[in-house]
Amino acid sequence: MESIDVINALGNEYNPDILRAAHQPRSAKEFSEDLDVPIATCYRRIEELTKTDLLSHHDRILTDGQRRTSVYRRNFDVIEIEFEGEDVSVTLQERSPVQNKLDNVWRDLADT
């Protein structure tokens, strides 16, 4: 992942909102409804964010309509952008596996 690619992705409309909402696994439909973003735009933004490794495919879940849908989660808890002279660097503090497991347990409990 190039720093400039991450910065460009963060500068695109809706991407920061999607990343904020992706602290727990969500489907494109959930992003669209919760953030009032057109569904086609959501899919394009998800693709862009996964290409820059800011978001990843987390799972495929069964919806209420008995259809499988993909859910996505951000790959980090903290992002730092540092400018030094003409150089720029991006550091991601990745989500801990323990936090991911806790999130999964809470999501499973909420679904029951």
Task: For every predicted segment, state its role.
Residues 53-54:
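Glycine-centered, phosphate/nucleic-acid-interacting loop/turn motifs that mediate DNA/RNA or nucleotide
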Residues 46:
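DNA major-groove recognition helix of helix-turn-helix
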Residues 15-22:
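Hydrophobic residues on short alpha-helical segments
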